[in-house]
């Protein structure tokens, strides 16, 4: 069975794990109906549209 020859440094270990520590920023795009920034592939919470089809009736 293979055994590591040297102990990995803190820098190497933390660099490898750092990908999990990054903040995940949501992907935003403009609503095609009102121009409000919304998360991709979701209904716009301001106007209720997604891909020019109304899914929510909002009494604004």
From Swiss-Prot:
Q: Extract the PANTHER family matched here.
A: 50S RIBOSOMAL PROTEIN L32, LARGE RIBOSOMAL SUBUNIT PROTEIN BL32
- Member of which family? Belongs to the bacterial ribosomal protein bL32 family.
One biological process term in Gene Ontology: translation
Q: Which GO terms describe its molecular function?
A: structural constituent of ribosome
Q: Please name the HAMAP family in this protein's record.
A: Ribosomal_bL32
What keywords is this UniProt entry annotated with? Answer: Ribonucleoprotein, Ribosomal protein
Q: Which organism is it from?
A: Borrelia hermsii (strain HS1 / DAH)
- Record-given protein name: Large ribosomal subunit protein bL32
Provide the taxonomic classification: Bacteria, Pseudomonadati, Spirochaetota, Spirochaetia, Spirochaetales
């Amino acid at each position: 069975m293979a055994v590591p020859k040297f102990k990995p440094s803190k820098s190497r270990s933390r660099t490898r794990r750092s990908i999990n520590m990054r903040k995940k920023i949501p992907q935003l795009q403009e609503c095609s109906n009102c121009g409000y920034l919304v998360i991709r592939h979701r209904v716009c919470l301001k106007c209720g549209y997604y891909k020019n089809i109304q899914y929510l009736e909002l009494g604004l």
